[in-house]
Amino acid sequence: MGKASGLLLFLLGFGFFVVTYNLLTLIVHNRSGVSNSDGSPLLDPVVQMPLNIRKAKSSPAPFHVALTATDAPYNKWQCRIMYYWYKQKKALPGSDMGGFTRILHSGNSDNLMDEIPTFVVDPLPPGLDRGYVVLNRPWAFVQWLERATIKEDYVLMAEPDHVFVNPLPNLAVGGFPAAFPFFYITPEKYENIVRKYYPAEMGPVTNIDPIGNSPVIISKESLEKIAPTWMNVSLTMKNDPETDKAFGWVLEMYGYAIASAIHGVRHILRKDFMLQPPWDLSTKGKFIIHYTYGCDYNMKGELTYGKIGEWRFDKRSHLRGPPPRNMSLPPPGVPESVVTLVKMVNEATATIPNWDTL
């Protein structure tokens, strides 16, 4: 377990070569984490997760908060809210948050450079993402890790639509990264597909954690090894019609999970890492609000998911520009998680300068 086979190197390398030789060369240069032709591993030995991992204390080491983004208005307003709440929670007791970087993979600077710490990287070559813009995420991290100066030894991979609802400690324990488990990431269900990228000789499919790359707190050292493989696997999967059809919009999440398993990296699964309204009803004991789902309710406070509600908050309603300041609060009976989310968005938009014009 943890040793990438020569067969895997051939399959991934050849698939990626078909896509773009230059990018493959760069990834190999950045230690893609597969074996040499003689079978010798380019990976660190696998460290088994200790039995007493649940009793271990969180690492006090600070972590760098990093998220990838485009220069689209939809991404910009989310990043501004996210950065606002990062600043509010960073200095509070219980927080291990260090620096912050918006990794901008548009290839050019934008008008948020002076507001949010930003590192500009190149997008994938035209057409390579095949309309699936999320494929730029692993490539962005590869470039950032290679070129940026990162003081912290740990990194939190976050997203623009994350809001820090409580101070976030370093949840990584004993060198093991921490991740949020997603119910829809089910490697065992797709074993016949997963085996194309994680062959049987590498270990059971259960070695692949039910996660994506975000939210994840991981050591910089581990991420430097995983990121090129994550990109390699994701691009190869996108170019395989069977895999692309099976995984759809979560393909890149499977890419990260499989790449981690290739490197023998297991994650501590933390359900308290994140909540997702409207399905999660309370923010108590949680750290991040992920507002990926629309919140639709009638005026009785009843959820009308799948149908536009009399009251709603859905980030997709604001694709071309930011939501207005002072949005109306949900009606009585709506879960605390949704109420808190709207209040936090309202506070951020009321405080951030030039909210409506930037």
From Swiss-Prot:
GO molecular function annotations of the record: hydroxyproline O-arabinosyltransferase activity
Keywords: Glycosyltransferase, Golgi apparatus, Membrane, Signal-anchor, Transferase, Transmembrane, Transmembrane helix
E.C. number(s) listed in UniProt: 2.4.2.58
Superkingdom of the organism of origin: Eukaryota
Tissue specificity field: Ubiquitous.
The keyword Transmembrane is assigned to this record: yes
Enzyme's top EC category: transferase
Disruption phenotype: No visible phenotype, but reduced level of arabinosylation of EXT3. Short-root-hair phenotype. Hpat1 hpat3 double mutants have an impaired growth of pollen tubes, thereby causing a transmisson defect through the male gametophyte. Hpat1 hpat2 hpat3 triple mutants fail to produce detectable levels of Hyp-arabinosides, have low fertility and shorter pollen tubes.
Cell compartments where the protein resides: Golgi apparatus, cis-Golgi network membrane
Catalytic activity: trans-4-hydroxy-L-prolyl-[protein] + UDP-beta-L-arabinofuranose = O-(beta-L-arabinofuranosyl)-trans-4-hydroxy-L-prolyl-[protein] + UDP + H(+)
Membrane topology listed for this record: Single-pass type II membrane protein
GO CC annotation: endosome; Golgi apparatus; Golgi trans cisterna; membrane; trans-Golgi network
Annotated function: Glycosyltransferase involved in the O-arabinosylation of several proteins including extensins and small signaling peptides. Catalyzes the transfer of the initial L-arabinose to the hydroxyl group of Hyp residues. Contributes redundantly with HPAT1 and HPAT2 to arabinosylation of EXT3, but main contributor to arabinosylation of CLE peptides.
The name this protein goes by in its record: Hydroxyproline O-arabinosyltransferase 3
Organism: Arabidopsis thaliana
Taxonomic path: Eukaryota, Viridiplantae, Streptophyta, Embryophyta, Tracheophyta
Gene giving rise to this polypeptide: HPAT3
